[in-house]
Amino acid sequence: MATALPRTLGELQLYRILQKANLLSYFDAFIQQGGDDVQQLCEAGEEEFLEIMALVGMASKPLHVRRLQKALRDWVTNPGLFNQPLTSLPVSSIPIYKLPEGSPTWLGISCNSYERSSSSREPHLKIPKCAATTCVQSLGQGKSEVGSLALQSVSDSRLWQGHHATESEHSLSPADLGSPASPKESSEALDAAAALSVAECVERMAPTLPKSDLSEVKELLKNNKKLAKMIGHIFEMSDEDPHKEEEIRKYSAIYGRFDSKRKDGKHLTLHELTVNEAAAQLCVKDNALLTRRDELFALARQVSREVTYKYTYRTTRLKCGERDELSPKRIKIEDGFPDFQESVPTLFQQARAKSEELAGLGSQQAEKGMAKQMELLCAQAGYERLQQERRLTAGLYRQSSGEQSPDGGLPSDSSDGQGERPLNLRIPSVQNRQPHHFVVDGELSRLYSSEAKSHSSESLGILKDYPHSAFTLEKKVIKTEPEDSR
């Protein structure tokens, strides 16, 4: 089944996108549903896009939907791949199927009116080169003939009828249209301000560059025939030759050089243009840098880093001044709110004072902790000393108790002596008169035990010794309890 050919610019754009995605079978369905606006497909939301896919019968084939989405993304990001540059002209209602016979216009726009509009209102506007890039055109030089411009197949019945080969038609060739893919386009150059900044930076850097020896350069060119054939003629030109700088720029370019394999439609970035300009300026100052491209590249990048920052900053400031607006990088300060930029030093001072105060409090806490620890150590030492004294007292008490008789009274000789005494002079045992529980001081207990032994051994049967011994025993009693019944 033959696919219908596009009649408008919108249909042609859709045709190219479907052709890129290998989905030309859906072209008729898109046209029948009125889907000749590619911009609508690109800006459609998820639900709207799925609805369009259902209308054209693509919703049931998700892989086809993915291919179409990828082609749409490529068309937005790099329209040069489709040989269809983006323009500000309407995407529909621009007939390319048939031109009015005998009209000196193309696409409904007069050449003179285009020149006026391109010079006054839209200086960057490019006429779409649909016919020049998508059709096979056969034009005669100075002859009047009818040519056929086939969009896809020469045998197709729908042909675009050609016209007289006028000067206006010749001006629509790809070389004269100034397409974005042309590396010699006027936009592939820095503006005057940026070039001036590069020149100033190179002037400052020039005294620091090492001086090249011309004899070494000639020796290098003599040994390298290929390099000599390429740039040898530049060293033979005089400085007054107007073509010397042009040749230097041609062979000093780092990016997008005439012999580089750069993809069609890819523009040079601001960084690349700056590096190329810096390399050209450096080679003008020192022609020998043409033979040392690695060193030239490093120097050009150094210049680019400095120039790009300064020029971009200055341009932004100038644009903001022209619009009488605040810089996008400046913090907007509302009325009634403090200036936080001015309060930063104050906040810093306050934070510093707080840190010093916290440090002082920390030292005080450390001192208090040390004092507390010393108090605890002293208390512990006193407690240990008290425990030691208590243990000593208990030991002395146990020692004094062990030295006494097993029944708790006086020694056995005392009892024996009492047995020899008359009945009327006998006294009850100390055990019968001494309570069970009493507390005795260590030293007095020891004194009591020694005195008791001496009295019991020296005054057996003597009555006068009893009161003294009884007095001594009465002094030792602290707590009186009933006698033991045993």
Swiss-Prot record:
Region named Disordered: 160-187, 398-438
Annotated crosslink Glycyl lysine isopeptide (Lys-Gly) (interchain with G-Cter in SUMO2) location: 126, 129, 143, 211, 332, 354, 368, 372, 453, 464, 476, 479
Compartments where located: Nucleus
Domain of life: Eukaryota
InterPro entries documented for this protein: Nab1_C (IPR006986), NAB_co-repressor_dom (IPR006989), NAB_fam (IPR039040), Nab_N (IPR006988), NCD2_sf (IPR038398)
Substitution effect: residue 51 to K: Loss of transcriptional repression
Region described as NCD2: 220-309
Location of Phosphoserine modifications: 171, 182, 327, 405
Annotated region (NCD1), positions in chain: 4-82
Biological processes annotated in GO: endochondral ossification; myelination; negative regulation of DNA-templated transcription; regulation of DNA-templated transcription; regulation of epidermis development; Schwann cell differentiation
UniProt KW keywords: Isopeptide bond, Nucleus, Phosphoprotein, Repressor, Transcription, Transcription regulation, Ubl conjugation
Molecular functions per Gene Ontology: transcription coregulator activity
Placement of covalent cross-link Glycyl lysine isopeptide (Lys-Gly) (interchain with G-Cter in SUMO1): 332, 479
Region (Necessary for nuclear localization): 306-337
Tissue: Widely expressed in adult. In day 16 embryo highest levels in forebrain, thymus, salivary gland and cartilage.
Function per UniProt: Acts as a transcriptional repressor for zinc finger transcription factors EGR1 and EGR2.
Assembly and interaction partners: Homomultimers may associate with EGR1 bound to DNA.
The protein's name: NGFI-A-binding protein 1
Organism: Mus musculus (Mouse)
